[in-house]
Amino acid sequence: MQNLRKRTYKQHGFTLIELMVAVSIFFFVIAAIYESFLSQQHVSFIQAQVSDMQQNARLAMGFLSKEIRMAGFGMPATEVNGFSNAITPAIDNNANGGNNVLIGTDQISIVTGYQQGSTLQSAASFDSTTITLVGNANLFNTTTKSFLYIDGVGLIDNYQVTGIAGNVLTVSPPLRRVYPAGASVLLVKAITYSVNDAMFLTRDENTGGGAQPLVPNIEDLQFAYQLNDGSWSNAPAVPGNIRAVRINVLARTSRQDPQWAGLGIRPANENHAAATVKDGYRRRLLTSVVAVRNLGL
């Protein structure tokens, strides 16, 4: 009989301590990866916020500088929707609240007619009281959109619309000269820019439609005015003496950054004092000086 021998096998595995060490290392690695992910996510979020903020500041500056530069162009001798100056400043608005203009911000109203509304379909005769447009006669009316001018080949003539029938406008006074077919007909507007309580840059054409929001997250808007004697004023007594405008647009991020808490503060801007309470918003201030082309000619 063969001898029965007991076979033994070498046992493999991990001890409890080894397993605990491995699990601890695993969780440390996962925590590091997660922390890195959160950090990258935060950086991406802030970069997106800052990018949007910078774009908003540039957009707001673009709207303002373009139309302020053209203030007074095509302006009639009479007032347009209550405005008789090419530029009408309004300083530190809404100190007492109630008009949906952000407290402490400035407001500016300009009269300009630089945008073409239509063209003449046919030549217009001297002393005629009507003109026929190619189209877009609905841009005009006899009340709030009644002032126009016709480009008379280097000569600008203002008229007021007194009647509309299709694309035929009745105007006053009678035409001062002959205008060729294709001559530009432009609507003169009174435009007011301000910042509302929701921190939107707004644009109001003062025709009854109210202020329309243009650009979000604009925290402050301030102006300074260079006068005909070269001096600067935040509140010029005679708007007709304005020759240039310094525009200051302060944009901020849409949300606070918890890691920036207590480091952000609205800065002083022209005659608007800095805020006294710190927060977590990031900000960007853009400043531009715009010469007004059509004043002082």
Residue ranges of each PLM-predicted region?
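Intrinsically disordered, low-complexity segments enriched in polar/charged residues with Gly/Pro
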Residues: T15, V23, F37-Q40, L148, ...
